[in-house]
């Protein structure tokens, strides 16, 4: 890594430590030319697959869109933000684990419903009613009956 002070090419690592619960590495480095010390952080760059919408439009995966959809369903429900973040991370892990460059938006919707079902049944019904375009109260009842099985 180049020295940020003298721009020399050669630096050495003096110390490395895991930070952020093991998700990144903090390194102390020293320039071999000017002897200045500096800190770097190393994080794995994980590429998410692109999303193929139902109309065949392709767009980059948008974590914020995923989060806002889940939070809308979970509004005023007793679910912690930590639990929501864990669910989002689980969905992202499942998407990466497919190994595909593109995934259908329907797959993401199904993964969201799976996580919401575990977090909060009311939020699950809210999300499912919009996602599956429930037309009447009968469809709500059928979905609730499936939950009780």
Curated annotation (Swiss-Prot):
Any one biological process term the GO annotation gives: negative regulation of DNA-templated transcription
Boundaries of every ATP-cone domain copy: 49-139
Pfam families tied to this protein: ATP-cone, Zn_ribbon_NrdR
Zn finger spans (unnamed): 3-34
One GO MF term attached to the UniProt entry: ATP binding
Keywords, comma-separated and alphabetical: ATP-binding, DNA-binding, Metal-binding, Nucleotide-binding, Repressor, Transcription, Transcription regulation, Zinc, Zinc-finger
Cofactor(s) recorded in Swiss-Prot or TrEMBL: Zn(2+)
Keyword tRNA processing: no
InterPro entries xrefs: ATP-cone_dom, NrdR-like_N, RNR_NrdR-like
Free-text cofactor note: Binds 1 zinc ion.
Segments passing through the bilayer: none
HAMAP family membership: NrdR
Its biological purpose: Negatively regulates transcription of bacterial ribonucleotide reductase nrd genes and operons by binding to NrdR-boxes.
Protein name as catalogued: Transcriptional repressor NrdR
Native source species: Shigella boydii serotype 18 (strain CDC 3083-94 / BS512)
